[in-house]
């Protein structure tokens, strides 16, 4: 009997919602399943209402993930659901901004803060999810990487400071930026003198005469000549 009463009340509630929607335009979006294909929603007001439902679900999940009675598996499930909701919210906001010419929610700072959480390797972690062992390990690695980057930046700043100090102490003379008076004239005169020497040397006969052969000897002839030369040297050494 009670099931029939509940069923009748449910039918009555749906009928009342339908009447209210037809007469005043009111629609309880929380009782409907959100569309997964956001691009199919062409009405700006309807898209904004669906986004509001996502924001409400995010608020409820953020409150739920702080519950101290949750175990690690439940915490991970809620945190994964929060990340999914954030992605859905971004899809609605992008559709509203680009396709429906609606407001840009990225620049709006009112209402529920839905940009919270700690982002680690592209994943947001909320509430007690930050206490999970593997998340603590990721946080430690992130902190070590941050310290390493800060140390690297500090070393670069120290090196720049040393370079500036060297430039101030050594001055432009060390780097050859200031040319002493008469240096350019001397270098030009010396260059002309060296060019004259090279030209005069080019006109003289070379000190080493390169023989001209009617034909080049073969490899066998060269080897025979080397053998004969070694034989003569050996005979001279032995006084033969």
From Swiss-Prot:
GO terms for cellular component: catalytic step 2 spliceosome; cytoplasm; post-mRNA release spliceosomal complex; post-spliceosomal complex; Prp19 complex; U2-type catalytic step 1 spliceosome; U2-type catalytic step 2 spliceosome. It comes from the Eukaryota. One of its GO terms (biological process) is generation of catalytic spliceosome for second transesterification step. One of its GO terms (molecular function) is first spliceosomal transesterification activity. It is found in: Cytoplasm; Nucleus. The keyword Electron transport does not apply. Keywords: Cytoplasm, mRNA processing, mRNA splicing, Nucleus, Spliceosome. Involved in nuclear pre-mRNA splicing. Associated with the spliceosome. Belongs to the ISY1 family. This is Pre-mRNA-splicing factor ISY1. It comes from Eremothecium gossypii (strain ATCC 10895 / CBS 109.51 / FGSC 9923 / NRRL Y-1056) (Yeast). The gene is ISY1.
């Amino acid at each position: 009997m009670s099931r029939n009463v509940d069923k009748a009340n449910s039918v009555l509630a749906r009928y009342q919602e339908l009447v209210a929607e037809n007469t005043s335009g009111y629609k309880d979006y929380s009782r409907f399943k959100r569309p997964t294909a956001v691009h199919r929603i062409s009405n700006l007001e309807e898209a904004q209402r669906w986004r509001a439902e996502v924001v409400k679900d995010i608020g409820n999940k953020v409150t739920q993930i702080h519950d101290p009675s949750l175990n690690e598996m439940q915490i991970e499930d809620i945190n994964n659901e929060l990340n999914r909701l954030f992605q859905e919210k971004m899809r609605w906001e992008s559709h509203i901004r680009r396709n429906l010419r609606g407001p840009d929610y990225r620049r709006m700072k009112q209402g529920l803060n839905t940009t919270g959480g700690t982002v680690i390797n592209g994943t947001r972690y909320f509430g007690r999810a930050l206490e999970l062992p593997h998340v603590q390990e990721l946080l430690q690695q992130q902190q070590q990487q941050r310290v390493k980057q800060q140390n690297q930046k500090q070393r670069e700043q120290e090196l720049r400071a040393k370079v500036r100090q060297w430039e101030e102490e050594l001055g432009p003379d060390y780097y050859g930026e200031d040319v002493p008076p008469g240096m350019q004239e001397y270098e030009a005169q010396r260059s002309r003198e060296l060019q004259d020497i090279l030209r005069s040397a080019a006109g003289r006969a070379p000190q080493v005469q390169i023989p001209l052969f009617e034909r080049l000897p073969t490899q066998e002839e060269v080897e025979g000549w080397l053998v004969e030369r070694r034989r003569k040297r050996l005979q001279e050494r032995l006084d033969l």
